[in-house]
Amino acid sequence: SVRQANITSQYYESESRLLTKYYQLDSQNLEYSLENLQIEYQKEDDLYMLEDKINDSQVLQLSFVQENDSLKIISLKTINLEE
């Protein structure tokens, strides 16, 4: 259906924006690059999370960690927002 195609398209656009931000990050200087690129993020312990709004009811969240001198993606998940 057209609606499903739109939702799929929104998801991939959101994924593309998140991955673009992720690959711009400097693993050697992570905190600085997050601030310098003005990327909003959350941090819990060693886990960093970037989010991008898919539509009015969903957000896509990319989680990653810094290991040695590199970044490693842990998950990419859709989160339903409360109605």
Regions found by a protein language model. Give the residues of each.
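Beta-strand/loop motifs with alternating small/hydrophobic and polar/acidic residues, enriched
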Residues: 1-83
